[in-house]
Amino acid sequence: MQLRLARNKDGNQIINLIKRCFKDYKNCYLDVDNDSPELRDVYSYFKNKKGKFWVYVDKNKIIGCMGYLPHEKNNLEIHKLYIDKNYRMRGLAKKLMLRIESIAKKYKKRKIVLWTCLLYTSDAADERNS
């Protein structure tokens, strides 16, 4: 398994990864054209905004991703942290978060922020809580 910077040509695989992750959540979908057009040229988008976007690749398949962009004056914002469900619980997301923490320290950023939505719960979580 390899962690590397995303390339523009990775867009379709990243989109497919996110769609696979969303399958576990009710009423959750990815509308790339209206909500996430940056995924089509992911490398250029993040580079032009002074951020970075990484992907985990296993056997030529993207199985995880995450990016960051500067946010406000002294913060970094995490974007699109997704790990394929078959690769979870291996510390992959933790490694990405440690990378972001290191970058934040290097550039003397005060906070790392992440926006998420609490409307979506997985069927598995619903079953555990019933």
State the predicted function of each range.
Residues 104-116:
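Conserved GNAT acetyl-CoA-binding A-motif
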Residues 1-2:
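Extreme N-terminal starter segment of soluble prokaryotic enzymes
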Residues 5-79, 84-85, 97-99, 103, ...:
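Acetyl-CoA-dependent GNAT
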Residues 94:
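Residues forming the Rossmann-fold NAD(P)(H) cofactor-binding site
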Residues 65, 116, 121:
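Ser/Thr-centric signal marking residues that sit
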Residues 120-130:
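Single conserved hydrophobic/aromatic residue that forms the stacking wall/gate
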Residues 84-86, 90, 118-119:
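Active-site acidic-Proline motif in GNAT/NAT acetyltransferases
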